[in-house]
Amino acid sequence: MLKVSAPWLASLRDELNQTCFLAVWGNKGPTVVYVEASMGAVTLVTQIGSVLPLLGSSTGLVFDSFLNERETAALREQEMPLLSADQLRDVKLHIEQIRTTGVHQIQGLLMPGINAASSPLFAMGNKLVGVITVVGPGSVLNDETQNLAARRLLQTAQAISERMGGSRPSD
């Protein structure tokens, strides 16, 4: 998957001039395994080996939307008590939206001033194998540019998934 994804992420980074990364589901949750850093500021959340929150990051929410509940249950149970009732409602709405659109955009969820968009990668059997994310400062990745980034990210995720023989499962 990394070999297939890397050139696409480099191209997306060049087009958007924003940091792009690939995360896989590791034994502690969403884990960054590959980063194409932008020429601008590199954020702390985009280091290889970083483990991201399941319910508190765009990347994590995409994993939670498409992985089997048994795979995410332990981490979800760990994180849910840290969220308010409003935040838990938002998580549910985000998951419904992600399953429908195949992309998730968020502003400042994990770190204030840092915006992100994430999209799932599927392989044969339409199995979720990773999530790609574009991340950048809110001053640059604002509503208009974030929408463009999300569209290009979704197109890139679909192309990578097709290359691996998969596609987003339909409900």
Located regions from the model:
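Cysteine/selenocysteine-centered motifs that mediate thiol-based redox chemistry or coordinate metal-sulfur cofactors
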Residues: 71-84, 88, 157-171
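Amphipathic alpha-helical effector-binding/dimerization core
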Residues: 1-76
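Extended hydrophobic
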Residues: 84-157
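Short, solvent-exposed cationic patches
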Residues: 54-60, 147-167
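Residue-level marker for beta-strand->alpha-helix junctions and adjacent short loops that shape enzyme
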Residues: 27-29, 139, 167
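Short helix-to-loop capping/linker segments positioned immediately adjacent to catalytic or ligand/cofactor-binding
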Residues: 8-12, 20-21, 78-86, 101-108
